[in-house]
């Protein structure tokens, strides 16, 4: 593999939207303070995890790219929120998308800089 190309992106949000009112009841703050800084936030439901969200986003990116699963040379997932130590999120994405098993799949655990390290 010689470098990489970012051809398409995908995205996924957790199913539970946490309102500012709901959050202000659990911490000592106000809706106005939260809105000025973060607006809405989304939390995973019991059925969701970093892996399920990564799979949904990767499926969307693959569809948008026009590539076949066999065209993908490597699967890299950057997360600090893996639901399990093993299998890695990348291996779960690889399996769910039908990517070739003889290609690398790895997680990058580098917090906020994960995207930079992963690319």
Write out the residue ranges for each language-model feature:
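Conserved "HGTGT" condensation-loop signature of ketosynthase/thiolase-family condensing enzymes
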Residues: 1-74, 94-97
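Conserved catalytic cysteine-centered active-site region
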Residues: 33-37, 41-52, 79-119
């Amino acid at each position: 593999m010689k470098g990489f190309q970012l051809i398409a992106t995908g995205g996924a949000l957790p199913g539970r939207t946490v309102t500012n009112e709901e959050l202000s009841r659990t911490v000592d703050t106000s809706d106005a303070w939260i809105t000025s800084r973060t607006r809405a936030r989304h939390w995973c439901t019991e059925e969701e995890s970093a892996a399920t969200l990564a799979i949904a986003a990767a499926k969307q990116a693959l569809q948008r790219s026009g590539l076949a699963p066999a065209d993908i040379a490597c699967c890299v997932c950057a997360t600090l929120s893996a639901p399990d130590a093993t299998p890695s999120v990348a291996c779960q994405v690889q399996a769910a998308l039908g990517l070739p098993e003889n290609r690398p799949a790895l997680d990058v655990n580098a917090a906020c800089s994960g995207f930079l390290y992963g690319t």
